[in-house]
A protein has these predicted regions:
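Alpha-helical transmembrane segments and their helix-entry boundary regions
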Residues: 13, 36, 105, 121, ...
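Hydrophobic alpha-helical membrane-insertion segments
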Residues: 115-137, 239-244
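Alpha-helical transmembrane segments of integral membrane proteins
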Residues: 71-104, 150-310
Length: 310
């Protein structure tokens, strides 16, 4: 509802300049925008329960079809970015805790500072300038794969589809196009998780139980994996779930910079053009992902911390 109180009429962006008032009104009736907003809301929600998210005002295509087309592109990017972010934050968090006050600690905290301070779209532009413009190590930031490579789509995840079909050239091209946007999302997302891992690890290392286990001469590897690692990761699942959800919504500008043509870029275009069905679908799908993500986070939390029972 909130998007509809903003200035601007989506109908005016699709009718020709020569359209009369009658033409505009007929188009408005065609998309159901002439009815009271509460009736529009209940009609839309009844359609959602049937799997119908409406028709895009701008493209006149079913929104569900566009979601199927665009969502896998964003999920592939966000999933790889999240995995890289999670691994980076765990590695730097424990490294910083073990080397507290030393050069490694300062370097890890500098990475956190950079990740917290830089806007993701600006960081993406810097990476493009360095790795594509100056070093020529990365492909042009246009799309997900080279235009002259053919690939049959099964899942919408280009890397997975390339593996299924055994198209190694397509796999290499897809990975090279993923490198910079994944690096962008990974570093930005790793900052808060790394800080959480570091703080938890320092707390565990300072606990009497850890000192007692260390004093009993337990092997350093066993001490790390059975005591420090698991206990330090207890607070991480909820924060990681929040970061994953933020990456889905926050990938909009990164997709725009890299011409990714994903779910986020599709939603941004819908927002700029006041395409109500597109915006509403983006909000609902994103909210649904948050519910699923936090459900998974709660399950992982219960596995890491036996004190939690549901």
């Amino acid at each position: 509802m909130l998007i509809r109180v903003l200035p601007g009429d989506p109908i005016l962006s699709i009718v020709p300049e020569t359209a009369t008032e009658e033409d505009i009104e007929r188009t408005r009736i065609r998309y159901g925008l002439d009815r009271p907003i509460f009736i529009q809301y209940f009609d839309y929600m009844s359609g959602v329960f049937r799997g119908d998210f409406g028709t895009s005002i701008q493209t006149n295509r079913a929104v569900v079809e566009q979601i199927r087309e665009r969502l896998p592109r964003t999920l592939e990017l966000v999933l790889y970015g999240f995995i890289f972010s999670l691994l980076l934050s765990i590695f730097l968090g424990f490294l910083s805790a073990y080397k507290a006050g030393k050069m490694s600690d300062h370097f890890s905290r500098f990475v956190v500072l950079v990740g917290n301070s830089l806007p993701d779209f600006w960081f993406a532009l810097v990476l493009i300038l360095i790795f594509f413009g100056l070093l020529d190590w990365a492909p042009p930031p246009i799309g997900r794969i080279e235009s002259d490579i053919g690939l049959e789509l099964f899942t919408g995840f280009l890397t997975l589809d390339a593996l299924i079909s055994g198209n190694w050239r397509a796999l290499g091209s897809a990975l090279s196009h993923l490198a910079l946007p994944v690096l962008t999302l990974g570093i930005v997302g790793a900052a808060p998780m790394m800080r959480s891992v570091r703080a938890s690890a320092l707390e565990v290392m300072g606990s009497p139980a850890y000192h007692c286990a260390n004093a009993h001469g337990i092997n350093s590897k066993e001490l790390f994996w059975k005591y420090l690692f698991r206990e330090s990761l207890v607070p991480l699942p909820v924060l990681a779930g929040l970061i994953f959800g933020n990456l889905i919504g926050g990938s909009v500008l990164v997709e725009y910079v890299f011409s990714w043509q994903g779910f986020g870029q599709w939603a941004l275009r819908g927002l700029l053009l006041r395409d109500y069905p597109v915006i509403q679908a983006f909000v609902l799908v994103t909210a649904g992902f948050y519910v699923i993500i936090f459900l998974i986070a709660d399950i992982v939390q219960a596995f890491l911390d036996p004190r939690i029972r549901y």
